[in-house]
Amino acid sequence: MNRRSLLALAAALPFAGAARAETAAAGRLVLHEAMASAHAKTRNVSVWLPPGYDASDARHPVLYMHDGQNLFDASTANFGEWGVDEHLTRLIAGDQVRAPIVVGVWNTDLRLREYLPSDLIAALPAEMRDEVQAIYGGPPLSVGYLRFLTDELKPFVDGTYRTLTGPEDTMISGSSMGGLISMQAVMKRPDVFSAAACLSTHWPLKVEGLEPGPRLDAWRERLVTAWTGVIAGGLPPVGTHRFYFDRGDETLDQFYGQFQTRIDGVFREAGYGPGRFQSLLFPGAQHNEASWNGRLDVPLTFLLSPRPTQTS
């Protein structure tokens, strides 16, 4: 894969707006258009309600997912959809997961900066920080994006839909840069989110110069040092929160293994065991929606393992 193709993959990488119904394979999909924020750019938000939502008074856990336009509907997706509604409808019918409300937070043209963890950038050596910020078009905007999620969007969702509002019932997930901000969300706001599923997490932050050799080795070592320090110092206490990571070994994912292995060690050294931490390799999987769709049952089951239903 050439440099231009890798860059294109990485860059696929816009208060309460008007709501309108969308089409879902099952359940009900509602689009809240142009949701304004004091902390982040205005964007659409899609909310998927599970089958049976309108026929009962049950309250539901909530899964927040980034890149919301790619989750449910191929007509709004840039590179194919995840099929979240299809996967969850089948898993719910088989009693494999709890029935969640899924909040799909659409990205904007500031996606890369909104998903770039500010703590990591602050921990980088100055020259690396400058290089990353030049690639991304400016400093991280993740603090404002997370404030939008926790201080504006979550109260709106909890006030509009029948949700279970506590952290034990609130999860977050994303892919690539969305994996980074999902992990950061649990670390920064463990009082809001109890679990994160991070697919094809984009640990290297950039794609330039990632061909094997001395430059990759030097970049990786300095970056892993920053990552491990930030993660070790920011993890919630063991026993209260959960983290899922995965990766393929093709296209952009081919660069993640050496990062992920080292970072997995930080979680294990902190005491995160199999019930609280999972890191999986899917051989042959690429860095795209088709691959994430193909294995989505695994992180969904990790996040939403069954427990008794609660009602109002």
Where are these regions (language model features)?
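Non-catalytic cap/lid and distal C-terminal segments of serine-dependent acyl enzymes
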Residues: 22-312
